[in-house]
């Protein structure tokens, strides 16, 4: 059995990894792991005023803060029965267009395109595609300018408030945005032609279900009051849990979603599959020109879908501004005296369906539930990677699995910061520690480091295990007191794996053994690990990636007590494994 891992996914937002486990000729498991620390926004918002909640919730992520702002505003206004003015509605949609342009242009050109034109990154790609790199940057700046002008800042803007805005853009600012959008259109055409014309890999291909907001009135758009499924079903906003059915997996901070026990996808491709025929103008013509049924079965077509949405956004901006400027006067923000209520806000973030549900009791927030696009996509990400890995293995191309899985993950453009906010990890991921330890020691001789306090019962298990390993002749065993000034151990070219031996509270039965990557332990706040963070600061990044924790669940860490019998048995199990 072997594992092919991408420990750090490049060209995505946040800290995640993907791994495939291979047993003979079968890919037995694929894990899309999210190591990003949890945001805890849903808990931090409790007891706050609605105004504080509207300011706090978007801070779950700086990449798509406008989407979160619009989602929490829609939820709170539904909860408090606030009816938005037309002016405010138009300006919220305008800043939403800015975010889509900024996010999509950055992703398709800088993060995705190198995968399909043979370059490792956008900097290297600039030698052959200088125009594309430059125009992507200009489109990104334009999107940022819209968000800053309308919402006060392009990251975590505070101008959007319950019932409207603190202030509205001037006529001059809006006229400039409109003229600039029109000037961009020739380059937007080039973008659509480029990404719709790329030769995308046919691997993997599989049907899935797509979900997105239903804008209503047979329109294309980025928000609504119900959820449209590619099956033809429609789910009202307040019944969103009938779609998401969230659950937790042990290898990730993010919750997962399944509909009727099956994975589903959200994002640009979901919107184009479900709503693409509603596109009008030039975006509609380009959709008719390029869209085929094969888009539905291949996640790589998220990228041409994003290109079409960039065109839609550039066409929509002049329409929004023209309608706004025809309104005679700017209406002030709408106020309310409602103190208790519950509401759901549905919007499309660039990465897909974003759901905010907020409840207010006696003027204070009493419940918050946020469902992000990447959390919904995670199951399909694993499924598509599993399909691709198996097909490549069957074709005798195992060497291509790692790179292909990484490209698939990037096609979904996961926003890992958003997705990591909600899962409360009460149990460390359970692993087959014997197999993991065997695989490691078979290839290299690791350095073992015993960590702990021998005077505090089971907290001394790491030190005792290290002592017994030394006694039976296992080489290169150290104690924590020996490592901080060990220059050979921490030198830059150190390549050997390091295994820390320690008591690890992962909410299991006493004596339970687990074997985990050190990075996962450091980022998991539900695990006890006192010395490891300071030790990791001494490591370079390759060492950190090549370090592990062999943890034993303690029964007690009371001072003055001896090791418990279950922990002593665990020590013997490890000794027997290494001695063999």
Feature locations, PLM:
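A translation/RNA-centric and nucleic-acid-associated enzymatic feature enriched
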Residues: 356, 361, 367
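A short interface-forming secondary-structure element
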Residues: 370-372
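N-terminal catalytic or cofactor-binding beta/alpha core of small enzyme domains
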Residues: 432-555, 561-580
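Short small-residue beta-strand/loop micro-motif enriched in glycine and branched aliphatics
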Residues: 53, 366-368, 558
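Active-site bordering "gate/hinge" segments
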Residues: 1-351, 361, 374-432
């Amino acid at each position: 059995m072997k594992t092919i891992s991408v420990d750090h996914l490049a060209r995505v937002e946040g800290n995640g990894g993907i791994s495939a486990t291979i047993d003979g000729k079968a890919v037995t498991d694929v894990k899309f792991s999210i190591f990003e620390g949890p945001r805890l926004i849903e808990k931090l918002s409790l007891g706050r005023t609605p105004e504080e909640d509207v300011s706090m919730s978007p801070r779950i992520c700086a990449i798509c803060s406008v989407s979160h702002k619009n989602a929490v505003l829609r939820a709170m206004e539904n909860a408090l029965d606030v009816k938005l003015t037309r002016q405010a509605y138009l300006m919220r949609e305008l800043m939403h267009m800015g975010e889509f342009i900024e996010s999509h242009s950055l992703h398709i050109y800088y993060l995705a395109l190198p995968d399909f034109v043979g370059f490792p990154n956008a900097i290297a790609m600039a030698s052959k595609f200088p125009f594309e790199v430059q125009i992507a940057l200009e489109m990104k700046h334009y999107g940022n300018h819209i968000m800053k002008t309308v919402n006060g800042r392009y990251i975590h803007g505070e101008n959007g408030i319950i019932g409207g805005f603190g202030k509205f853009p001037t006529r001059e600012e809006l006229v400039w945005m409109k003229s600039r959008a029109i000037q961009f259109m020739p380059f937007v055409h080039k973008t659509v032609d480029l990404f719709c014309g790329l030769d995308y890999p046919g691997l993997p291909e599989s049907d899935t279900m797509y979900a997105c907001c239903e804008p209503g009135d047979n329109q294309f758009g980025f928000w609504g009051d119900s959820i449209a499924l590619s099956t033809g079903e429609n789910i009202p906003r307040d019944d969103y849990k009938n779609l998401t059915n969230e659950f937790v997996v042990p290898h990730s901070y993010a919750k997962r979603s399944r509909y009727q026990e099956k994975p589903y996808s959200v994002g640009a491709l979901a919107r184009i599959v479900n709503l693409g025929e509603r596109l009008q103008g030039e975006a509609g013509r380009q959709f008719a020109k390029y869209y085929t049924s094969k888009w539905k079965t291949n996640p790589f077509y998220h990228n041409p879908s994003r290109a079409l949405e960039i065109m839609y956004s550039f066409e929509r901006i002049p329409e929004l501004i023209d309608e706004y400027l025809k309104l005679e006067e700017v209406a002030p923000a709408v106020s309310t005296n409602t103190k208790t209520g519950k509401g759901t806000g549905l919007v499309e973030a660039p990465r897909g369906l974003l759901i905010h549900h907020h409840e207010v009791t006696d003027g204070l927030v009493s419940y918050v539930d946020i469902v992000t696009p990447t959390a919904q996509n995670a199951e399909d990400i694993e499924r598509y990677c599993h399909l691709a890995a198996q097909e490549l293995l069957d074709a005798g191309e195992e060497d291509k699995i790692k790179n292909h899985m990484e490209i698939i993950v990037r096609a979904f453009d996961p926003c890992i910061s958003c997705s990591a906010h909600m899962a409360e990890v009460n149990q460390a991921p359970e692993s087959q520690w014997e197999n993991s330890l065997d695989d490691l020691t078979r290839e290299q001789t690791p350095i073992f480091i015993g960590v702990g306090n021998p005077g505090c019962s089971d907290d001394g298990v790491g030190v005792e295990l290290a002592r017994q390993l030394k006694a039976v002749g296992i080489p290169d065993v150290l104690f924590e007191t020996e490592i901080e000034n060990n220059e050979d151990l921490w030198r830059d070219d150190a390549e050997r794996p390091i295994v820390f031996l320690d008591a690890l509270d992962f909410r299991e039965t006493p004596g339970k053994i687990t074997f985990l990557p050190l990075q996962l332990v450091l980022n998991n706040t539900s695990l006890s690990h006192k010395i490891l963070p300071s030790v990791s600061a001494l490591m370079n990044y390759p060492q950190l990636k090549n370090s592990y924790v062999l943890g034993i669940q303690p029964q007690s860490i009371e001072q003055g007590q001896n090791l418990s019998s279950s922990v002593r048995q665990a020590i013997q199990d490890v000794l027997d494994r290494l001695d063999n």
